[in-house]
Amino acid sequence: CINSIINQTYINYEIICVDDGSTDNTLKILKNLSINNSRLKAYSINHTGIPSVVKNYGLKLAKGEFLLILDSDDMITEYFLEKGIKYFQDNPVDIILYPIKFMFSNNNYKIIGGIYNNSLNISDVNYLGATNKIISGRDAFRFNIYNKLIGFPFYKKTIDKIINFNEESFNGDEYSFREHLLQAKKIAFIDTEFYVYNFNQESITKKIGVHHWDTWKTWFNLEKLAQKHNYEKKLIKKINKIRYSIYYELCIKFNKTEYLFSQNEKNIILNKILENKNHLSRINSIFDFLFYKCKDEKGKYIKFINKYTFYYKKIKGNNVFFEFKTNK
């Protein structure tokens, strides 16, 4: 990651490295690097396990006019900064989105980015969408919710003076990215350079932990954000539907991974699931009165005339204690 910045053709930058209380030699390595590179500053905080906390700490220290946030496993291509800063200087935009190059362990990769005509299934796509447009932040938010926009952001610093990163859950930065889109007046794309994402199964976001059962808060907050900005009911209903799917997936995840946790951890997770359920409130259209499909802790079901429920796919191995707890 650091080498990809040091090797940039643009050199007027500052590197702020924040170590999230690691127990290896990370901080020592960073401080040694800073001795030989005055543009690199190394800091450490007590371990949180929440990326947004680390990012907000770095934001407070950042002094530059533009802002790029990288994870330690990832990198940027050689002309990333040079082309981005020139575009900022020549055009009145607030965010530039770059394609993402996903690198896998078998040296295979795929490049995705831009605006797509149809909802994007990342596992099936390996091509760029439209990148020759400048769009409003409001449209970018809408495209992203419908899974038609993807890109890695390079910010004008003013965006993050207004909005920091959400710290409610370990994936709070996913909420903040969309909030930043809304804050921007104009958003552009560069498709000749890439953000390189190394798909690491052992990264903090891949490991199963209690924090996974907080991820529902991101979409709960996105629903409130969309309502606050007076988006159409169709979009808000889309978010609401995603929230029910997340609840369902988290219930399945608990059933499959329960054996990994202590009894105390199980109780914490169950309380998080209950909190999630208590914040769910379905948004219906007039057509949903006759019947609609939905999901909950028991499985997938159809609701008829808002009264009768038929489960057509139940969650296998549903723990009796779990079912009792989530329905009391």
Language-model features: locations:
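Short, well-formed alpha-helical segments that are part of the catalytic scaffolds
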Residues: C1-N7
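Conserved nucleotide-sugar donor-binding catalytic segment
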Residues: Y127-T215
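Glycine-rich, basic loop-to-helix element that forms the pyrophosphate-binding segment
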Residues: I45-A62
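Membrane-interface aromatic/basic loop that binds lipid-linked glycans or pyrophosphate carriers
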Residues: F254-K328
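Acidic donor-binding/catalytic loop of UDP-sugar-dependent glycosyltransferases
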Residues: N25, D74-Y87
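Short aromatic/hydrophobic "clamp" motif used to bind/position activated sugar donors
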Residues: L67
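A conserved acidic beta->alpha catalytic loop
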Residues: D19-K28, H47-T48
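Flexible acidic/His/Gly-enriched loops in nucleotide-sugar-dependent glycosyltransferase catalytic domains
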Residues: V53, E82-I159, I163-N164
